[in-house]
Amino acid sequence: LFELARDCGRRVELAVETKHPSRFGGAVEQALTDLMDWFGWLPTESNADPGPVRVMSFSGRALTRIRHRSPRVPLVYLVEKPTPAATRAGLPGHAATLGISVDLLGASDWLGRIGARGHGLHVWTVDDVGRIDDCLAAGATAIITNRPAEIRRHLATLTG
């Protein structure tokens, strides 16, 4: 996947989710940051570009491990339930973005509180164009879908 993104001739951003990383004691995060470094995509203090990879996880510990390896990698904390205790005081692992299921849109006002703190909002998996307005109303900064062409066409009709 990294090779395809590198070789496609234009910038492609990758959202990499670490699945159940806690079982491996940091090996997943180590391997991922090593791969990012090998491709030259591990952000450094001297490089203003955070790179094309953002890391997503349901594990705050995994995000903290990534943060320790490279403080500038964009991080997304994924949640499955509204108002998780972990997000009341901010996002774990120094994540700048909250990632939620499309089913959580409109669940309560907790998304507004997250946005008021300046955090981004990623919504997954949005395959129904009828949910786009909900995503935009919630302040989504990214929409994750299995139907990118269809979603892009719909977004184009909204922006003219």
Feature locations, PLM:
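Short loop-to-alpha-helix "cap/lid" segments that border enzyme active sites
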Residues: 1-160
